[in-house]
């Protein structure tokens, strides 16, 4: 596990922590099934990932996402450029996904 989150993870965490985003409770850098996820909301079974250059191996990410999906989670991935340039779009997508997950329960 990293000791220092990368820039874009820090930006997302500022929005997600302390239930700032629509009252959703997220944890960061959480280990689940041997994987470290950037942010996780257990109530909505939602995982949010900030994707930087280290995520160039899409096959590995896809296998990881499939495993998480099989555990009942939905994984949202946002490229760093989207977090930087279209932050409101990212926030809207996270809230919509959480609402969708809640209405399915």
Annotated model-derived regions:
Residues 1-25, 98-105:
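Solvent-exposed, charged helical/coil patches
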Residues 1-6, 30-97, 101:
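Basic, amphipathic alpha-helical patches used to engage nucleic acids or provide basic targeting signals
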């Amino acid at each position: 596990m990293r000791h220092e989150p990368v820039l874009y993870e820090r930006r997302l965490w500022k929005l997600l922590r302390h239930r700032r985003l629509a009252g959703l409770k997220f944890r960061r850098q959480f280990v689940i099934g041997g994987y470290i996820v950037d942010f996780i909301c257990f109530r909505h079974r939602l995982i949010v990932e900030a994707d930087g250059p280290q995520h160039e191996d899409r096959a590995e990410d896809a296998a990881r996402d499939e495993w998480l999906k099989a555990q009942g989670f939905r994984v949202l991935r946002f490229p760093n450029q989207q977090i930087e340039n279209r932050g409101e779009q990212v926030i809207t997508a996270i809230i919509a996904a959480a609402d969708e997950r809640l209405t399915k329960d």
